[in-house]
Amino acid sequence: MITRGRVWKFGDNISTDAITPGRYNLTKDPNELAKIAFIEERPEFSKEVKPGDVVVGGKNFGIGSSRESAALALKAAGVGGVIAKSFGRIFFRNAVNLGLPLLIGNTDPLLDGEIVEVNWRSGEVKKEDGEVLKFKPLDSFLLAIVEEGGIIEYIRRRGDLWIQ
């Protein structure tokens, strides 16, 4: 699970309402949700985001209401995953359940607009200047869910959620 793309950097306390604002959040269609991702925070996001791009946050990324649409919008937009100092617990589980990779660690060295290569399995992020940053990857069980494409595909393929 390696992606390469542009860093879209955000600050601390980015709520699910900032990712998919309620007044625009009128559909369950993933492609329509992708169009409203960060519409008020970064209006250019939905038009410029490319497959493999990485959303980077500070502390408490995805806090707030239990809006599954926030993680779904990012995945549908083609985001390769999200790296943050910490995550809101509900966003964290929604992202895993939808198959959106996550890493945790100090995001200060990552710069908005730079191109990075992310190994979601090992937690290594390689910057264009050659610097390699190390982040905490998901544990093996959660990573298996993400690699299957989310909880539904995980259960379809494996038959249950039994942890071995």
UniProtKB/Swiss-Prot annotation:
**Reactions catalysed:** (2R,3S)-3-isopropylmalate = (2S)-2-isopropylmalate
Entry keyword DNA-binding = no
Q: Which residues constitute the signal peptide according to the record?
A: none
Enzyme Commission code: 4.2.1.33
Q: In which pathway does it act?
A: Amino-acid biosynthesis; L-leucine biosynthesis; L-leucine from 3-methyl-2-oxobutanoate: step 2/4
Q: Which SUPFAM superfamilies match?
A: LeuD/IlvD-like
Output the GO biological process annotations, alphabetical, semicolon-separated. Answer: L-leucine biosynthetic process
Question: Keywords in UniProt for this one?
Answer: Amino-acid biosynthesis, Branched-chain amino acid biosynthesis, Leucine biosynthesis, Lyase
GO molecular function, a single term: 3-isopropylmalate dehydratase activity
Q: To which protein family does this belong?
A: Belongs to the LeuD family. LeuD type 2 subfamily.
HAMAP family named in the record: LeuD_type2
Describe, as the record does, how this protein assembles with itself and its partners. Answer: Heterodimer of LeuC and LeuD.
Q: What is the name of the protein in this document?
A: 3-isopropylmalate dehydratase small subunit 2
Species assigned in the record: Pyrococcus furiosus (strain ATCC 43587 / DSM 3638 / JCM 8422 / Vc1)
Biological classification of the source = Archaea, Methanobacteriati, Methanobacteriota, Thermococci, Thermococcales
Gene symbol of the encoding locus:
leuD2
